[in-house]
């Protein structure tokens, strides 16, 4: 399992600092997480390289691809993969404890249609995801960066929408979910302004939680406390 950081440079050779949507908090791996990475990475892990993936080589078939950015500890992603063996799933997460937990859960569940990466998703999209190859892109509960001065760090912005669109198939879905109402409004504003997308909600707003997105313990607790969760789906139409 390798980690590569790719930098851009000015004409003078100075490094251009990128604004990232995440803060890397390594945390300490449990023995179980570390063991899962050592055991499962050769078969389920994908190292970052500057070369486009061949999904047939990765999964051994041409089933539809579902890609999730920031899967946390991976419980929901593993459940989705287990419930949809006719699809292929790729999860991208920057925090190694989450990657280890996901691999451990995948092994226990016996899923074979899941692969994971531990790298910055933007760089993965730029260097490894082929155009018109992703059926569904999932972004569930990204960091809301709720302070106004930090909004520039939000992953959902015009540049991101433009970057991911060619990676989706025609008719492909970008599915977002957040428990911050302000961020949900921001998501819709950004995506409505982005060319080549349409909101699939009949009222042009939000959709009920789809059955395919598992209800997390965190989300269930939020419901009990009266907290809202907003699901948004945009379709590539150009």
Swiss-Prot record:
Catalytic site: 143
Residues the record lists as binding substrate: 147, 179, 216-219
Family statement: Belongs to the class I-like SAM-binding methyltransferase superfamily. TrmB family.
The protein's name: tRNA (guanine-N(7)-)-methyltransferase
Pathway(s): tRNA modification; N(7)-methylguanine-tRNA biosynthesis
Catalytic activity: guanosine(46) in tRNA + S-adenosyl-L-methionine = N(7)-methylguanosine(46) in tRNA + S-adenosyl-L-homocysteine
Cited Gene3D superfamilies: Vaccinia Virus protein VP39
